[in-house]
Amino acid sequence: WTEKGWNQAMREGNYDRSREHLNFEIRPGGMVAPIDKSRPLTRRMAENLASRGIKDPNEGLAEPRFRTVVNFIFGGSTERMRELAFGNQKVDFESKEGNEHIRRMPEIEKWAQDIYRFVADKYGEENIVSFIVHCDEKNPHAHCALLPIDKDKKFAFKKIFHGQNRIDYKNYLLSLHDELAKVNEKWGLTRGV
């Protein structure tokens, strides 16, 4: 982010720059690592596709026409996610500064690894372009960017996620929430609506 971008996000949003050092990513194999800011999402996607010999169907189009990325946000209740991320440390969530001393707890890493493994097992680890955990916002959470590519190495958003109609899509999402609830159960997180 630029300095101007950070200042605006802190003014308007729920970011705390003094906790940015707590953010991390999960890399292939479930490895916890600092976020590689040198590789933006577009570059990660291009590298992933090139390494697998898959062409981006939106390449060369003036406007994208195909769903080539699925973005997930994983999280839970604010209170429980803060417990996982910060334990019993005193964090100032209101001033959005002065939290440089806060340490990231191993529980948030283990939770993220469990969610990563769920996504990898369900959709293929090779299709995960990024999995980033934010602990610098009011409610810690994970962002996952996934390529909807099937076993034939074809982009297949509708086949994988949507089904034939809205009812199929709704049922798929309800089922997905049920599956995630089983993963989150051990972390004291209950299924949302």
What residue ranges belong to the model's regions?
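N-terminal nicking endonuclease/strand-transfer module with a His-rich metal-binding environment
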Residues: 1-193
